[in-house]
Regions:
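Membrane-interface extramembranous regions at the lipid-water interface
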Residues: 1-18, 34-69, 121-153, 168-201, ...
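Hydrophobic, aromatic-rich membrane-embedded alpha-helical segments
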Residues: 18-38, 150-170, 204-221, 258-275
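Residue-level signal for secondary-structure boundary elements
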Residues: 26, 30, 51, 76, ...
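Membrane-helix interface segments in multi-pass membrane proteins
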Residues: 77-114, 219, 223, 227-228, ...
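Short, amphipathic alpha-helical segments
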Residues: 93-104, 112, 116, 120, ...
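Long, low-complexity, intrinsically disordered cytosolic termini of multi-pass membrane proteins
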Residues: 264, 301-321
């Protein structure tokens, strides 16, 4: 197998993480975008495929501009909500019951709207600024399509008390995979919503019976299923990524991370992140028969699509958080 490999060290990441947290706190989060870029550069540089490390080329200035847009939207929304509450108090001598429910719906609608916008912006920033052997990654997703998928999926998940989440996550994975490019490589997701639901249902029921202990097996099943149903295409070639993570490895990861964070009163969080990242990367394998040297930058000529006329795609704010 051509292993993806992560060689990051907990102590190195702790130093980076500790400084970034302090600077973000002192600067009232204004240096948070700089922290995102610094951490991405470190994590990418410690992740390799076929012995060659990935490279993150994103700029702090671009991340800062995207983050400031998020803050601006949040400030405007909060100011509007506060003004509305003050007007209601002045008009009615308090906040009517109907207004409380209305405000809750407005807040929910804002969250449902802003979430896919931020996901879209993050994908644009992090995917498009990732390179491997000078081969650039790209993200082709349209915000209008992601918005429709996200709002519908989240609302149905809420209305069905979480039952629809398996269908929503499967659709979301398929959308994201099909819109990510790795040079001449194309991706898709072949997972089944029904099979995902079966894994979730089994995990939920056995998790209750075993007082949460079965979550270890559930994590293993979800991870292996997701990786093993990720399909990679290059021309006429097609293969699935592979993972055979076992229960012992997952137990050591989850229990070890929980103890690490609890015993150190949170200071072990960076080490826990590195352990999780190492597990996720190192258990994702590419078939040995696939020639990594065949990956070329923009090898496949795709049909030009007409620019979307949807206002969301024209706006395309590229928020980053």
């Amino acid at each position: 197998m051509n292993h993806l490999k992560f060689e990051g060290k907990g102590l190195d990441y702790f130093k980076l993480f500790f400084v970034d947290v302090i600077l973000a706190f002192v600067s009232l989060t204004l240096l948070y975008p700089r922290a995102l870029v610094r951490e991405a550069r470190y994590l990418w540089s410690e992740t390799s495929l076929g012995g060659t490390a990935f490279e993150f080329r994103g700029k702090s200035k671009v991340a800062f501009n995207g983050y400031m847009k998020v803050l601006l939207l949040m400030v405007i929304f909060i100011m509007v909500m506060v003004a509305e509450i003050l007007i209601l108090k002045k008009s009615f001598g308090g906040i009517p019951y109907w207004a409380e429910y209305t405000n809750a719906l407005i807040i929910m609608a804002f969250v449902l709207f802003i979430m896919p916008v931020i996901i879209h912006g993050d994908l644009n920033f992090f995917v498009k600024n990732t390179a491997w052997r000078s081969v650039m990654l790209d993200y082709k997703g349209k915000l209008s399509e992601l918005m429709s998928l996200s709002i519908r999926g989240n609302i149905l998940t809420i209305l069905t008390l979480g039952i629809f989440s398996a269908w929503y996550e499967t659709q979301l994975c398929k959308f994201l995979m099909e819109n990510i490019r790795f040079g001449s490589l194309r991706f898709t997701y072949s997972g089944s919503s029904k099979e995902m639901f079966r894994i979730y249902l089994k995990g939920f029921l056995l998790g209750i019976v075993t007082l949460g202990i079965y979550n270890i097996w559930n994590f293993r099943d979800l991870y292996n299923y997701s990786v093993n149903h990720t399909v990679v295409r290059k021309g006429d070639q097609e293969f699935n990524l592979h993972s055979d993570a076992n229960t012992r490895e997952v137990f050591e990861l989850l229990v070890g991370n929980a103890l690490l964070v609890a015993i150190t009163l949170g200071f072990g969080f960076p080490w826990a992140c590195i352990r999780l990242y190492r597990f996720m990367v190192n258990h994702c394998e590419v078939p040995e028969a696939f020639n990594l040297d065949s990956i070329e930058d923009n090898e496949v000529a795709e049909e030009l699509e007409e620019p979307s006329k949807h206002w969301l795609d024209k706006w395309n704010p590229n928020l980053i958080a």
